[in-house]
């Protein structure tokens, strides 16, 4: 099945890396959190390569603090996966770079980042994958936007469908309105999100 193009979103996949962003106390409870996070990275890289999709990978760290994160990738990825990741990774910055890439991506994938929720609020399509075997990181909205079964074929089928369908169709396949996420969690940057959303749509109008 061919994946439809979206001219306004010129990047296919944004993968948000959640490396080392969980509380270390969870490691003492023997949850396979690290394994779940790396499984998603591997699945997403494989999906992008096999389907020849354009991908951006958001590092957890800023460039000058990348050492430990880089070691994590080297330890857990194959040489091919590691080279692919480094070729497509970008580093966190103090500006809105990650949000800008997110707005230009057809699907945003991750496990626990708040950006998965913010992307939904900004009318983007999210796939939140919790392969950690603990419901602590379950996405608060159910439906096409969340997946807990760490089977590659199911992941690929779900991601392909999300990319292919329209935004309105996607929104009809989730069980709560995206605004639920923002107001429920009361992010400090909600005002910034609204400003970004308005600026983004104004920019699109100017380009029409």
Segments and roles (model prediction):
Residues 1, 17, 59, 93, ...:
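Residues at the C-termini of beta-strands that transition into short coil/loop
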Residues 2-77:
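Conserved catalytic-core segment of nucleotide-activated headgroup transferases in glycan assembly
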Residues 14, 56, 107-109, 127-129, ...:
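Hydrophobic/aromatic beta-strand patches that form the interior of the parallel beta-sheet core
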Residues 32-40, 154, 186-190:
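Soluble or luminal CAZymes and related metallo-dependent hydrolases
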Residues 43, 47, 158-161, 173, ...:
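Charge-rich, solvent-exposed alpha-helical interaction surfaces
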Residues 62-122:
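Donor nucleotide-activated moiety binding/catalytic core segment of transferases
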Residues 79, 114-185:
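Catalytic binding pocket for nucleotide-activated donors in carbohydrate/polymer assembly enzymes
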Residues 183-208:
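C-terminal alpha-helical cap of glycosyltransferases
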């Amino acid at each position: 099945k061919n994946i439809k193009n979206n001219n306004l979103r010129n990047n296919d996949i944004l993968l948000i890396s959640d490396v080392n962003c969980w509380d270390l106390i969870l490691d003492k409870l023997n949850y396979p959190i690290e394994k779940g996070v790396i499984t998603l990275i591997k699945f997403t890289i494989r999906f992008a390569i096999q389907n020849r999709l354009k991908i951006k990978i958001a590092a957890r760290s800023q460039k000058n603090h990348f050492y430990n994160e880089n070691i994590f990738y080297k330890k857990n990825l194959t040489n091919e996966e590691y080279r692919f990741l480094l070729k497509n990774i970008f580093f966190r910055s103090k500006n809105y770079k990650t949000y800008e890439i997110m707005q230009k991506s057809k699907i945003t994938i991750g496990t626990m980042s708040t950006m998965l929720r913010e992307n939904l609020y900004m009318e983007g399509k999210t796939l939140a994958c919790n392969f950690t075997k603990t419901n602590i990181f379950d996405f608060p909205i159910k439906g096409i936007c969340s997946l807990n079964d760490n089977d590659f074929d199911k992941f690929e089928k779900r991601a392909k469908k999300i990319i292919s369908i329209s935004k309105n169709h996607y929104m009809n396949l989730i069980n709560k309105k995206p605004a639920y996420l923002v107001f429920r969690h009361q992010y400090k940057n909600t005002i910034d999100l609204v400003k970004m959303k308005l600026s983004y749509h104004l920019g699109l109008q100017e380009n029409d």
